[in-house]
Design a protein with these regions (language model features):
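Membrane-interfacial helix-loop-helix connectors in multipass membrane proteins
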Residues: 96-119, 178-230, 234-261, 284-288
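Helix-loop-helix hairpins and the membrane-proximal interhelical loops
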Residues: 49-72, 80-81, 92-108, 286
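Short, membrane-interfacial amphipathic segments enriched in basic
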Residues: 7-67, 246-251
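Hydrophobic alpha-helical transmembrane segments of multi-pass membrane transport/permease proteins
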Residues: 78-100, 268-282
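Membrane-interface segments at loop-to-transmembrane junctions
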Residues: 68, 158, 162, 252-266
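Long, hydrophobic alpha-helical segments
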Residues: 118-139
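Helix-loop-helix junctions within the multi-pass membrane cores of secondary transporters/permeases
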Residues: 145-203
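Selective transmembrane-helix segments that form parts of the transport pathway or gating/packing helices
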Residues: 76, 80, 84, 130, ...
Length: 288
């Protein structure tokens, strides 16, 4: 029996080839199919706006507004304490570094390091958090049976597409702006207090916020965070609904939803990083 089992086992090079083929398939799925899914979903969403603009009764308007509020609250409240804890920790750490460089180098630290931190680093850290938490939840919800009501059609209708996607897009945009504002304020407080916990809540950051480079960095950081939050929700809705439609057309597999959750996080971070580089090349680099 052992000899038969050994003979039936595929050779090592066969397993290596199978692993390489699975890896190539996963990479191709991430870099080829998912961008196509995202582009097609965006076009469908833009075309579906007609059903919202021309068939918006008062009852439907109230239901839509309430869905915006409820989805934003569900997205914002659970992550609030996590973002607050990370922001306070990052703020105190930034203040400790500013105190360590000394008073002579603190103006350079404020004009260079703080500007890059608020304008570039903080939005990217925020999208990693939002993609791993909010994006995964949206993709799992929309890809599951409970996410979208059952239908005989293998394609989600325009009305249903707007109904399930729009609240998540609005919630992602608002949550990105609010979370960044909270994090940026804690970072500024940490710098002004020089990392002293006793002065962290009593320090006044007004003089620091009046500096023009800091104001520009804050506004650009808010803009980036809103775009990134919207992007996370868009990718999650696209991959989640695509997984749902694959299940409507054929046998539903748990792996489809799992892949949608994983690829939402990875895809959102990749697209946001690429967009951040393009924004830096188009807007920030020419100003230097």
């Amino acid at each position: 029996m052992d000899a038969i089992g050994v003979e039936a086992r595929p050779p090592v090079y066969g397993r290596v080839i199978q692993w390489c083929l699975r890896f190539v398939g996963r990479v191709g799925h991430l870099w080829v199919e998912n961008p196509w899914i995202l582009g097609a979903f965006t076009i469908r969403l833009l075309l579906a706006w007609r059903s919202l603009l021309f068939d918006l009764s008062p009852r439907q308007l109230n239901r839509t507004i309430w869905s915006f509020i409820s989805e934003t609250a569900r997205t914002f409240v659970p992550g609030l304490f996590v973002v607050l804890g990370l922001s306070v920790t990052l703020g105190l750490g930034t203040g400790a570094v500013a105190r360590a460089v000394g008073p002579l180098l603190q103006p350079v630290f404020a004009s260079v390091v703080m500007t890059v931190l608020l304008r570039d680093a903080a939005p990217l850290v925020l999208i990693v958090f939002m993609a791993s938490r909010m994006g995964g939840i949206i993709a799992a919800k929309l890809g599951s049976v409970e996410g979208i009501p059952a239908s005989e059609s293998p394609v989600v209708s325009d009305q249903e597409l707007i109904r399930v996607a729009l609240p998540h897009l609005v919630a992602g945009t608002i949550t990105g702006a609010v979370f960044f504002s909270l994090g940026a304020y804690c970072i500024v407080l940490g710098y002004v207090s020089l990392g002293d916990p006793a002065r962290f809540l009593t320090a006044s950051p007004d003089w620091f916020l009046e500096l023009k480079p800091i104001q520009s960095a804050l506004w650009f950081g808010v803009f980036k965070s809103m775009v990134f939050g919207h992007l996370v929700a868009l990718v999650a809705c696209a991959l989640g609904i695509a997984s749902r439609e694959r299940g409507l057309r054929g046998a539903r597999r748990v792996a489809d939803v799992q892949n949608a959750v994983w690829e939402t996080s990875v895809g959102s971070i990749l697209v946001a990083t690429l967009l951040s580089v393009l924004l830096w090349l188009a807007v920030e680099a020419p100003l230097r």
